[in-house]
């Protein structure tokens, strides 16, 4: 009687019965890493957003840490996007191209 629509309603086992949650899957990019400068919603402070990097979360965090050290500034990883504080697009482009990534400067 195992049906994909049936689930356990009552059990004498202790504890809460939770279904395991699937890890969110990010869509694959087109192979181009884009660097965009953004100031909106940041009280006039500019940040560079790096999108399109096809790495898992642990490797993305390592890459962000390395870029922050080389740029000498702060940053964060949010929802698969690396944020680097300040307008360092040219330096970021050269660093990512040295790693063998195809990079485009997007936006204004």
UniProtKB/Swiss-Prot annotation:
Keywords, comma-separated and alphabetical: Protein biosynthesis, Translation regulation
Protein biosynthesis is among the record's keywords: yes
Listed Polar residues bias regions: 1-14
Domain of life (superkingdom): Bacteria
Stretches for region Disordered: 1-31
UniProt cross-references to Pfam families, sorted A to Z: SUI1
This protein's record includes keyword Protein biosynthesis: yes
PANTHER family: DENSITY-REGULATED PROTEIN, DENSITY-REGULATED PROTEIN HOMOLOG
Family: Belongs to the SUI1 family.
Protein name (Swiss-Prot/TrEMBL): Uncharacterized protein YciH
Native organism taxonomy: Bacteria, Pseudomonadati, Pseudomonadota, Gammaproteobacteria, Enterobacterales
Encoding gene per record: yciH
């Amino acid at each position: 009687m195992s049906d994909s629509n049936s689930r356990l309603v009552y059990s004498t086992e202790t504890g809460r019965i939770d279904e395991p949650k699937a890890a969110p899957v990010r869509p694959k990019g087109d192979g181009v890493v884009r660097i965009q400068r953004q100031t909106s919603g940041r009280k006039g402070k500019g940040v560079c957003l790096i999108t399109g990097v096809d790495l898992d979360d642990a490797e993305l965090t390592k890459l962000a840490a390395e870029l922050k050290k080389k740029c000498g500034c702060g940053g964060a990883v949010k929802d698969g996007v690396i944020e680097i504080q300040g307008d360092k697009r040219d330096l970021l482009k050269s660093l990512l191209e040295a790693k063998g990534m195809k990079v485009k400067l997007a936006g204004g």
